[in-house]
């Protein structure tokens, strides 16, 4: 209230009396403060609550994935897999799941986590033994993350399923497949080879990305869980959470029913059972190891291993 800033041009004067007449609520507030000994203050409009913002998710450059998908000759897990299922099949799997090779530990495996929208959420680097295919845990556990190795400041990692990018495939073959979820990335790859009628995903650990937010990508899908031995009860407790999103959910107890006490104590998973019987590729690899000339013979005549189970 008071004189207009442009009084010299308009001559208008808005008096305090007129202001309080037009704004009785302000007058009442000031009078109340004076009655209780308060100092009159100018009325302020109520503060607006700021909308809650979700923490920003960091992504890795997609070209890092492409750059890593080479030098498989030094990748111990790749070399192990070629003995299990053959080079051609491994090449297809590593391309489908976008598995890479790192310079760390002489060629460690990089399991890239790419979400359904094509964003690269994370890259897990893990060391494997080329002979056994097992993780290297001695003299230290060979596991790291790409963003840590690259020293990316303020990187906010939010994991997704390993293999989640396959859910964006709208082809009739992939989109109609039931989704099978296991714990480890290596298990997902092995199962994808032997049981291709499922789309195999991995949580990346007992808990990993197994949470309410991450499972939203499974909306409307038929999902079956294949937990490691000893984790069946814990994973079965996740069913109500999945049932609120998925069209149908099941937690397989197949391994629990067929496992021995020793196997159960070892916490084996479905991949361990799939590899219990030697594949033709594994038998051939042992034959070549005993007689390297056999590989030269195969290469010279372009021989291929025929699956006896195929007609």
Language-model segments: residues:
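TOPRIM fold recognition
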Residues: 3, 13, 116, 176-179, ...
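Intrinsically disordered, low-complexity segments enriched in small/polar residues
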Residues: 9, 30, 35-36, 84, ...
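Short, exposed beta-strand "edge-strand" segments with a Pro/Gly-rich flavor and a Y/T-containing core
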Residues: 82-83, 152-169, 258-268, 272
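Non-catalytic accessory segments of DNA primases and related replication-initiation nucleases
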Residues: 1-108, 130-150, 220, 230-231, ...
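Intrinsic-disorder-associated interaction segments
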Residues: 58, 70, 150-155, 263, ...
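Surface-exposed flexible segments
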Residues: 14-25, 121-128, 194-195, 240
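Phosphate-handling DNA/RNA-contact segment within nucleic-acid enzymes
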Residues: 110-219
